[in-house]
From Swiss-Prot:
Record keywords: NAD, Oxidoreductase
Reactions catalysed, as given in the entry: myo-inositol + NAD(+) = scyllo-inosose + NADH + H(+)
Catalytic activity, EC: 1.1.1.18
GO biological process: inositol catabolic process
Keyword NAD carried by entry: yes
Name listed for the protein in its UniProt record: Inositol 2-dehydrogenase
UniProt keyword 4Fe-4S, yes or no: no
PANTHER family xrefs: INOSITOL 2-DEHYDROGENASE, PTHR43593
Function noted in UniProt: Involved in the oxidation of myo-inositol (MI) to 2-keto-myo-inositol (2KMI or 2-inosose).
Stated family: Belongs to the Gfo/Idh/MocA family.
Length: 347
C-alpha cells in the first residue's frame, strides 16, 4: 500500500474532448495523481494538452502503456481502439479506466473479460460516469433504502441538442444509449432479458436511414419493465432523466440541474448544451475515486469489465431489434467469480 503523500503516475490515451477533459482533471482536480504522459496521433493536439503539466507526448498509445513512467492508464481514444488498448494494459498489468464503450462489439468486450479473468484480478474500470453523478447517487440510495418499495419500472430519457452528419443508427445505441443501458442495470440490479426497439428519422440532414430518435422497451430477468428514449437531435439542449417506479412510489433524477429563476410572471431554467457541462462533477468524482482506490492498493470499485461487456450484449440485441423490427432476446449472462458481488475475490 502506498503512503498518502505519494501520487499515481497516469497516462491518457486520446486528447480530444474527453481525453483533454480527463487530463485537465487529473492535473488540477485529483491530488493523488500525476499526469505524466499523453498520447494522440495528432501530436500537436497532444502537446497542447500536455503543456501545462509537462507530460511526455506519445504518438502511439501502445508505447505510452508500455512506458515505465506510466503506472495507470486512462483511455479516451476512438471506440475501435478501446479493446486493443485495454488488452495491452492487462498484458502489462496496469490499471486502466476506459471510456465507454469498453469495445465496439460484445465479442471484443468478451475478450477483455476473458483476459482479466485469466489474470485473476480486476484492473479495468469502464467510464459509466453517471454512477458518480450526485443526483443519480441520491436516487440509487433512495431505491436501495426501500423508500419506494422494490423497483418495478425504469424510465430513462437521453436527449442531445444536435449532432453532425456521419453517425449511424447503430452509433446511437453504442455511443449514447449504452449509458442508459448501464443505468438500468445499475438501478434495478437485474440483467435485461428482452428488448424491443423502434426508431425514426427526425433530422433529414443525417440521412433517411439514420434513426436519430429511438425508443427501447425492455424486460429484466426478474420481470421488471423499462423504457429508454434516446434523441440525439432534440433541438433544445442536453437532458438526461431517470425515473424509478417502485411498488409504493417513485423517485426521479431531475432532468435539469440549473437554478430556476422566477421573474416577470415567468419562470426559466438553464439547459446545458452538452454532457461535459452536465456531468462535470461526476467526471471529477469518478477520477478521484479511481485514483484513490489505486493509492490504497485496492481494485477499482466502479463499473468493471463485466459491466462494460454486459451493456454491449444488450446493445447488440437492441441493434438486432432495430433492424428486424421485432423483439429480441438478450443472451443470458452469468458473471465469472471475479465479477460476482456476493463472492470475495483475493489476489
Amino acid at each position: 500500500m502506498r503512503g498518502d503523500s505519494e501520487r499515481i503516475a497516469v497516462g491518457v490515451v486520446g486528447t480530444g474532448g474527453m481525453g483533454g477533459m480527463h487530463a485537465e482533471n487529473l492535473h488540477f482536480r485529483v491530488p493523488g495523481a500525476r499526469l505524466v504522459a499523453v498520447a494522440d496521433l495528432d501530436t500537436r493536439r497532444a502537446g497542447g494538452v500536455a503543456e501545462r503539466s509537462g507530460a511526455e507526448v506519445f504518438e502511439d498509445g501502445f508505447d505510452l502503456i508500455r512506458s515505465d513512467r506510466v503506472e495507470a492508464v486512462v483511455i479516451a481514444s476512438p471506440d475501435p481502439t478501446h479493446a486493443p488498448l485495454v488488452l495491452e494494459c492487462l498484458k502489462n498489468e496496469k490499471p486502466v479506466l476506459c471510456e465507454k464503450p469498453l469495445a465496439d462489439s460484445a465479442d471484443a468486450a468478451r475478450k477483455v473479460v476473458e483476459a482479466e479473468v485469466e489474470l485473476g484480478r480486476k484492473l479495468v474500470q469502464v467510464g459509466f460516469m453517471r454512477r458518480y453523478d450526485p443526483q443519480h447517487v441520491a436516487v440509487k440510495e433512495a431505491v436501495a433504502s426501500g423508500a419506494v418499495g422494490a423497483p418495478v419500472l425504469f424510465r430513462g430519457w437521453h436527449r442531445n441538442a444536435d449532432i453532425e452528419p456521419g453517425i449511424t443508427s447503430e452509433w446511437v445505441v453504442i455511443n449514447a444509449t449504452i449509458h442508459d443501458i448501464d443505468s438500468a442495470r445499475w438501478f434495478i440490479e437485474e440483467e435485461i432479458e428482452e428488448v424491443y426497439v423502434r426508431g425514426m428519422n427526425t433530422a433529414p440532414k443525417l440521412g433517411a436511414n439514420v434513426w436519430d430518435l429511438q425508443l427501447i422497451q425492455f424486460t429484466t430477468a426478474g420481470g421488471r419493465l423499462g423504457s429508454i428514449e434516446t434523441n440525439v437531435v432534440s433541438g433544445y439542449g442536453y437532458e438526461v432523466g431517470v425515473e424509478i417506479v417502485g411498488e409504493r412510489g417513485t423517485v426521479q433524477v431531475p432532468p435539469l440541474s440549473g437554478a430556476i429563476v422566477r421573474r416577470g410572471f415567468a419562470a426559466s431554467q438553464r439547459i446545458e448544451d452538452g454532457w461535459l457541462a452536465r456531468f462535470h462533477a461526476a467526471y471529477v468524482i469518478e477520477m478521484q475515486g479511481w485514483v484513490g482506490a489505486l493509492l490504497r492498493g485496492e481494485a477499482p470499485a466502479g463499473p468493471d469489465a463485466w459491466d462494460g461487456y454486459a451493456s454491449l450484449v444488450v446493445a447488440d440485441a437492441c441493434i438486432a431489434s432495430l433492424r428486424s423490427g421485432a423483439p429480441q432476446k438478450v443472451e443470458t449472462l452469468e458473471p465469472p467469480t471475479l465479477y460476482r458481488r456476493d463472492v470475495e475475490v483475493t489476489g
